[in-house]
Amino acid sequence: MVRIAEYSRTATFAWSNDRIPYLVSGTASGTIDADFSNESKLELWSLLGTDADKPSHSVSTDAKFKDLDWSADNKYIAGAMDNGAVEIYEFNSSKQELKKQGSFKNHSTVVRTVKFNSKQNNVLLSGGNSQEIFIWDLNKLLDSKANYQPLTPGVSMSPIDEIHSLSWNKSLAHVFASASNSSFASIWDLKAKKEVIHLSYTSQNTGLKSDFSAVEWHPLNSTRVATATSNDNEPLILVWDLRNSNTPLQTLSAANNQGHGHSKGILSLDWCQQDENLLLSSARDSSVMLWNPQSGEALTEYNTTGNWCFKSKFAPQAPDLFAFATLDGKKIEVQTLQNYETTLDEEVSKTKQQESETDFWNHVSEEKAEIKSTVVHLQAPSWYGNKSASAQWAFGGKLVQVTKDGKGVEVNKPEITDLKSDDTLKNALASKDFQPLINQRLVKVVNETNEEDWNLLEKLSMDGKEEFLKEALELDEEEDEEKDQEGKDGDEFFQKIESNFQPSGSFKIDSNEESVINNILSGNNSKAVSELLKSGSILEAFVVAVTCNDEKLKEDVKDAYFAAHGKESSLSRVLFSSSKKNSDDIVENLDISQWKYITKSIYNFHANDEVERTNKLLQLGDRLLANKNRQDALVIYIAAGSLDKIATVWLNEFSTLENKIKDQEKTIYEAHIECLTEFVERFTILSNFVGKKQKITNESLISKFLEFINITSATGNFDLALLFLDILPEDNEYVIAEKKRVMVASGKVVDQSQSRKGKYGSHANLASAGFSGHAKQPVNLPPTAAPFAAQTMGGYAPQAVGAVPTPAVPVPQTRNASVSIKSNPYGPAGTNVGTSDNKFNAYAPPTHTQVPVATPVTSSFIPPANPYSNVAAQSLAMAAEQNAMSPNLAGSAPPVKSPSVYSGQTPHLNKKANDGWNDLALPVKEKPQRAKPVTVAPSPILAPATNGAAAAVPTKSIGTVFPPTGGNSRVPSSMVSPPPPQKRASRTPSLINIDDVVNARPKAHTSIYAPQTTQAGPAPVAPQSDIPLAPTANPYAPNQSVGSTPLQKPVNPYAPPAQQAGIPSAANPYASQIPSKAPVNAPPPMSSKKAPVGPPPMSSRKKAHEGKTLSHEAASVLDSSKPVQTQPIASELSREPAPVPTSASQTQVPPPVQETPARNTISPIDMAAPAVEQGISAAQQPIRDFFSSELARVTPLTPKEYNKQLKDCDKRLKILFTHLEKNLLSQPTVDKLLHIIELLKEKKYHEAMEVHKDIATNHAEEGGNWLTGVKRLISISEATA
């Protein structure tokens, strides 16, 4: 038996109209529980609930239920009570709660049945004894409960007494049917206000009229209705067509189905709303029958273990499920229609028959009887038989479906209007501003521990790691002040000693000290110390050892002191560790409540040993964690820079947070997704502030990130998935597989089968890459020269400028020429023996080959610039011939994420520090100089276009041309500059991440092969023109004159470039070269001035320092005069390459944009365009006045241990005032701040906190660091009110 759920209640029930339905049960009238309790309850059950004995919600009632019904909109539940009342309950789906709205006693006796109208959710029918049928309008009923009077249906044509069943017509909202014990079923029309038809049936066997116990309308046909008889001798289901109401259209009985049917009176009917060929009935014989009311066939018999199965109902929106209730069995059971005996059941039966007698009697009391259904006629429901659209969700949130004709497949991505994507995390990763995300999380924390974590991150984001640790690890302010005062007194004390003591007067050597004094005066200090130590004069021994400055004697005296007094005081223990410069004893044995002293000893004793300092900090963190000081342990792990330890702590708590979210009435999947997202956000923010350069090695952590990436990709958010994939280690096989999958699904990797491979890699077809939105701009240009023509250039050789284009005869590009005689790569051009293979020699000079001359042709191809030439020195009037190392791409293409392309040399552990392996790691400022002249024929100066197409200046499409994906394609020089010329076979590939360069901000670099030019900002876009583009010059070979047109001088690759107005220099060799009419200055470097910072969260814990067992002397020993060092663990990933020496001839390079440090992280509004301080407006002045006065009010009322919180609150509020002065807040945010002030004045602190949450949720980007200050002030104001 396919049992879905079973509830041990003797109760009637009703289904909700949900896809995953709820079930509500009410204690059945006329029954007594097993414990003889007379208690009555209305209980709500969820089919997804794990505990069948615990309802989702329960309400006690004054009477028991005869019937229950649920409105079609799921809002109201009506109960027919045995005390003559109709009770209305409201269902809150979000909280899964039932709330009683009223009890209405208009019936004179018991109410037997209630029924909601399926067309009008507010209309309710109720039926009872004494011909009482009432019609209720819930809208009016709930508005005026005391004065409301229900309506009656009108005049009855037939005698009726007890109303057993009511049913609304499914097509006509004003028509309903009733069944009573008077042998009549009545059809009522509310428009006519009377009974319009009555039905009766006379038995052919007995000649007596049968009483009707149930009535049910056809789901589609308004003239067809079914009735059931309660006669135990002849139980029948009669289907009527009202157009011929004298004779039943169909009779459903056991006699007509070879004995398959009910044997006793039928008590309920339910006609399936989704399939008119299915009718469910239950009877006193404890059976449930499934019928085909159209053909009259019995389909399936569902036997129950109880007696009197008085109600059975399909789930309205999940008709494959049905429930039935029994009296004797004391249960409500939910089953599925697929309750058939399977081969597995047969095998179980055979196994039981083969077991021994002993096993049978041992298990007979434990086994639960499972009664299988009897299939009379197998009939599939219509929702299985109908052909539905064949569809399947695919990776990336796409929907794949078969077309209506069944001959094709459609793939699309549905847009869900009610589903709003939250891009807060994605925006935070892009801008490195995590404050909006932190603000949102602080107002929806999971539990107290989770709130402490987000408070810690908020403090980190405001102060930065260094300031955060400095404040977190210092002792209380009072102790610091006393220490400073004691330091001053100590200096004065020593000054007094030095100035006041002067020996005077006569003295005599004591006889007991003669031997010691003799040794001292004789210079025998070793014996003197030995005698002093034997006599216990350790102080005098110290003086002798210090005076003679003998290190061995000093050690002996110290050893003697510690042997005698080491266990007497904490000062002695600390002095021992200090003398040895060893923190082992303090780290292992000092009371963990004084962990800040332990931290001071670690930083003092291991100031120059980073590895040992980190190990000791981790040891201290483990002690704190074992002692349940979780938050202090996290602070120490942050000081040690150990993301792995913090990740382990958070991963261990993952299931706890997930269960907490699950308790908030969310499904298991929803709770898991929300918890996983929160964890990823939390760890991402932490790693950004603590261990940005660290490599993730924790397998469990990688697994969580991969799960998040998989879910993110499944929704189509590939950009966010790729951002996280770049964080994970590239050598992990699962990360590699996931990255390939995401890259292919996002269309950022070109299938190798669609690429045309050449000698230097595949030349991808732009169309096959899936790029869109960038139209190709047609430009006239000459065809490229033949592979062996004189104009054919190497991969790093720009061609001569101003040369007459020489058409080429198409020659297939084969990987191996038939004859290949390699020339000297450094020799002069022009020597060609036989056939050369220079087309594929990246460093070879051009050769001379006679080719036929033809007129230029128009092509839509826009060649990319030579990535290894000096871009700024080339005139924009010339065009580059196709680079042998570049792909055949044109137009503006989006950045292509390439899996590890190959390059010339391996940059050692420097993936993101610089874009080029031999570029300068630091900004270099040098005086720009013009290039030295080269002895070549002068070239004509190209003037701006005045008239005619010939004078127009061509330009490439606005955008960037990128290298091909995959293969052995070369990479731009902004990533890896070329090594000296060498043979191709000697090149060693290395893995380079192209996205790090493409998506990076432009930086100025220098290269020993490609001198840089002065960086300029973006130039205005000029209109494109169709003009042939000339080839570029070769910096490694003399220029060849073709035709009579004079050549423009080539670029000297080892000399500074000449400055030319209107040509923006490209730090990125793939950036578009856009001409301008005037020089454009480079943008000034971003200011590194520290941004305003905001306050820590209110709930951050203030731990009182427990230092009662450690003396101030010990604290003075631990405390060093040097500042506390907070150096992170050294990591190879964080090392920057040494700067490459540059010559004085290099041009001046403005410094690149510096990455904002963690401590300066502010919201985008803080980074907004120049904000001019305009002063706080009159409308906003109350914000400053009230917050300032309120802070002044609470300050003297707040305990001293919260002084830090007050100072922090003051600092954050000053940030808010600065924002107001600069007019950086939007009007809605200002209005809400003013509303908070009004609520605080009225002492409505809870409402004020809700407005604060609204700002944090809907205006998180404006909240910045000041928002926590407002929250803290609200809390302190409430505490001191």
UniProtKB/Swiss-Prot annotation:
PANTHER family: SEC31-RELATED PROTEIN (PTHR13923), SECRETORY 31, ISOFORM D (PTHR13923:SF11). This is Protein transport protein SEC31. WD repeats lie at residues 5-46, 60-99, 106-146, 158-198, 207-250, 261-301, 329-371, 392-412. One of its GO terms (cellular component) is endoplasmic reticulum exit site. It is a peripheral membrane protein. The COPII coat is composed of at least 5 proteins: the SEC23/24 complex, the SEC13/31 complex, and the protein SAR1. SEC13 and SEC31 make a 2:2 tetramer that forms the edge element of the COPII outer coat. The tetramer self-assembles in multiple copies to form the complete polyhedral cage. Interacts (via WD 8) with SEC13. Its main location: membrane. The keyword Repeat applies. Disulfide bonds: none annotated. Residues 960-991, 1010-1157 are annotated as: Disordered. It holds the Pfam family SRA1. Belongs to the WD repeat SEC31 family. GO terms for biological process: COPII-coated vesicle cargo loading; endoplasmic reticulum organization; positive regulation of ER to Golgi vesicle-mediated transport; positive regulation of protein exit from endoplasmic reticulum; protein transport. Keywords: Cytoplasmic vesicle, Endoplasmic reticulum, ER-Golgi transport, Membrane, Protein transport, Repeat, Transport, WD repeat. InterPro entries: Sec31 (IPR021614), SEC31-like (IPR040251), SRA1/Sec31 (IPR009917), WD40/YVTN_repeat-like_dom_sf (IPR015943), WD40_repeat_dom_sf (IPR036322), WD40_rpt (IPR001680). Residues 1037-1047, 1118-1129 have a biased composition (Polar residues). GO terms for molecular function: structural molecule activity. It is found in: Cytoplasmic vesicle, COPII-coated vesicle membrane; Endoplasmic reticulum membrane. Component of the coat protein complex II (COPII) which promotes the formation of transport vesicles from the endoplasmic reticulum (ER). The coat has two main functions, the physical deformation of the endoplasmic reticulum membrane into vesicles and the selection of cargo molecules.
